[in-house]
Amino acid sequence: MYNLNNEYKDFIKDNIVDSSKNYYSMIFPGIPDSGRKIHVSCTLKNYNNILDIVSRYCVKNRISFKVIKDINKYFANGHKNGDRSSYGKFITIYPKNEDDFIRHIENLYFNLYDYEGPFILSDLRYKDCKCLYYRYGSNIINRTYDSKGNICRLIEYNGISYIDKPRPYFYLPDFIKNPIEQNENISKSSNLLFKYKIDEVLKFSPIGGVYKAIQKYTNLKCVVKEFYPHTAIVNEKIDSLFLYTKEVSNLKKLKEFKFIPNIIEHFKDWQNYYIIEEYISGDSLDNYVSKNNSIILESDYKKSIKYIYDAVNILIKVTENIISLYEKGYIFTDLAPDNIIINKNNVYFVDLESVFMLNDNKDALNYTINFFNCTNSNEDNIKLVITNLLLYCFNKKSKVYDKFTPRQILSPIIRRCYQVDNILDLINEINDSETSIFRIKLLFEDYSKKIFSAVSSGEYNEPNLEPTKKEIFQVKSTMISSVGYEYDILENKNSLAYGTLGQFLALNYIFDYKHSKDTFLNYIKDYRSNSFFYGYSGLLYVLDLNEIGSNDIVEKILGNIDYTDKSLSTGISGIGISLLYNYLAKKNANTLKVLREISLTLKENEELDNSLETGRLGVSLFYIYYYYIFKDTEALSLAEKIINQVILDYKDNGYKKIISNQLKDNHYEYYLSNGICGLLSVLVEFTIKTKQTKYTDNIIEFTKLCFGIYSLSSSYFHGNAGFLYTFFRMQKNINISKKLEKNILNQINNFYLDITNTIINDEVYDISLQGNRKNFLGGKEGVYTILDMVNRNDDSKNIFPFII
């Protein structure tokens, strides 16, 4: 608790409420459902004084307020990975009405005028007080939920309703008037925009934006880097202004290096600080890898070898730059893949606030996890960053580099291209205690020459791959802990697809458990959404699977269907599939009537994308099951029509994915949720349910496109478990040649090993580093279900969402 020093401190201590994991609240009667709310920001120097002043005023005037519980979390939110829409909101005050708001904010203005805090992006500043802000918003939880079961903050204003969404900018609907005419939200100065035309936003963070711009009087392309005051706070001396000053100093000191952008100018404009520097065209290393890593995006072996050669040559230049800095007494502590620019034959370093002298005090240390270690020597950190940048060129799962060995990290790639095994030898040499950092560049150059020589002589030929041997990973009941229902009024934590309900589904599938109705009582009470993935339709399926009476659930669903949402995940395609499963057992006439209405409504689906989760493939899955149950030939025709259109769209455009906002090039998407594996699974389902083989050639064509794919995630709907599921069912149900089957079996084994390679102590670690993530489509429950299916060599169980 904070150190209050006003006459109400004992009253506050006795009456403050620990209202949530993030706030302490002082509640008085009269909080409106929605209205003006006042936000007060703070700095490390003044937060106790500000809280003392504001709490005294609020208690004296009986105004409800809340304060951030942990001041360290408040400041952490102001760093580069924080939430721009919420940073700065130290205290929130809830006036009872508009008149009270005007009176109280004016009084607080006089009390807080001399204090500063970060600018709150979602609010208007009150006059010229640098810590006092306000906005119109929702104040209560009114139990209005979206289709995913999460709270919508609904505002009713003079009979008009709208959703109050978090935004990193000020927003006020036209029908709500601002009672205060004067504010200081907009800059009094326009030095930046007078000189520069902003062309593109490169990135945003709570610290500020980075923009691509043009200098108006020269037409020179440049980068504008923005620093908001009172962000990136580390201690009373180190914050965003310190970072700004440090980067300006570094750019000037390092101008002798050709791989450092030139600084054009720097200045303060209004309250913000700006650095203008030379624009370096090209891709960040992060984007370069996404665009060019042909080992996992192509089946062309020669392209894969060329990529290895190119990656090694990039690392030669990176190493050369690092050693050049080191020889002059510098080290770059945040040399992450997004701070390296690949420009034709050159490699540049950017974002230089984290360049230090070797013996500097590094209190203001910025670094990216697993590319710097505060406890290492400078030389060991150079080896660490070079090693992990090299690993990143082949496997971008950098957040778990400290969890796995380089061999484990590279093994999925080595199975797809054996020559990557030599990268392991290179890494071992780099990290040998006898290897000097000055020798690393020579190691890369020698390896580059070997690759070039081998390619020229034809030594590297595409291998004749034999099925990879795998050890069976035995799934045990102790690996899935059904913690059950978790109450959270704001967020739906209990959905079938991405919540706690999926744990029971995994136990059903893997161990044939039958749960009692008592297990699901809290789920039944908590009605938020009708949807298949997130709401009652998913619960209905689980109840039916466990042979638990569900008539009340069915009636609730039938009475609350939104026919405008047609998707599998949240709309009538998924709801319809759950109702079809229920109808098979119950033969409810009302259910049949609604199913017919759903079938009619889904005929119009052109507005949807082509994905399984949110698009037309989900609609086609409903029609496949509708045909299977009712032998309705129109449903069969509709399923075929959708599938044919998706295939045609694919041939014209492909499943396209922008891997990064900065990328102009597209790549195929493969995932079950929204890619080729989703299409393949629907085609397999069509073949099984209709006993027709008309799509066999298409299945073979799309299967070949998936050879060599690999995901950074092990999950079922967005990763390797989905690939494994798709290929396993295809191998079991589609008539293919022996040669193709051999290749498919190799892919199955690869996917299996890709997954088991990420399991530590029964937890599945993916790129998110969430080893204890417990849900079906995105977590370990789905992963273990698919592994068990392959272990049994049996696809007779219908795995969600393919449930019929």
Label each region the model flagged.
Residues 115, 438, 442-485, 685, ...:
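Terminal, non-catalytic domain-edge segments
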Residues 262-273:
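Short beta-strand micro-motifs within the conserved protein kinase catalytic domain, predominantly
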Residues 249-259:
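Structural motif at the C-terminus of the N-lobe alphaC helix and the adjacent alphaC-beta4 loop
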Residues 354-422:
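C-lobe/activation-segment region of protein kinase-like
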Residues 148-200:
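Juxta-kinase regulatory segment immediately upstream of eukaryotic protein kinase catalytic domains
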Residues 322-342:
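Catalytic-loop of the protein kinase fold
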